[in-house]
Amino acid sequence: MEVFVPFDATDPKTRLSDLLDADERSAVARAMLRDVLDALAETPHQPRVLATEDVDCSAPVTVDDRPLTPAVNDALAAVDGPAAVVMADLALVTPDALGRLFEPDAGVVLAPGLGGGTNALLARRPAFRVDYHGFSYRDHVEAATAVGGDVVTVDSFRLAVDVDAPDDLVEVLLHTDGRTAATLHSLGVELAPTESRGAVTRRS
């Protein structure tokens, strides 16, 4: 089964701008992509990166600079059989977490993000199409039902945490020791406990 990994190689992770400059954000984004590809390499499935420009990585790359939704939908339409989509910013993902996505025998399997988005999915219904936006999980449930697919939702912390904002980096530093965590450490990003909850800061 082919697994598409969308990746913004042009101007990634702009919500980290208060903490990281453009080159640093690019380095973190590429580290996350490689963490995701490392996890996928331990599954039986073949990843393909859908990138806005060419990127050096361990998987084949298809360059498509269109917005996320049309790029993914055209990729899904070109596949004869089941296909999955796993976002490139799931820095906490593990082979076991991916196994929970790939295992259910359902028409559509969805892994929602913490804010209501869709962080990963598996589609066995050829007519299923995506529509990515803030609350896309809810709409993807409806879209799967509309094409006659039974839907399974995967409740997984490691699939639910995607890295967009500085607070998300807390989870990376707490729960992983992969390429992303190493890159953050090299940039001087570290945990900064507060009275209410953890945060991150940069060493001066």
Explain the meaning of each model-derived region.
Residues M1-L16:
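N-terminal nucleotide-binding beta1-loop-alpha1 segment
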Residues A29-Q46:
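A short, N-terminal amphipathic alpha-helix
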Residues S58-A84:
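Short phosphate-binding loop-to-helix
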Residues M87-A91:
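The conserved acidic donor/metal-binding loop of glycosyltransferases
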Residues V93-G117:
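Conserved donor-nucleotide/metal-binding helix-loop-beta segment in metal-dependent transferases, i.e.
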Residues L122-A146, S204:
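Short, glycine-/small-residue-rich phosphate/pyrophosphate-handling segment
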Residues V147-S204:
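Conserved alpha/beta core of the MobA/IspD/sugar-nucleotide pyrophosphorylase nucleotidyltransferase superfamily
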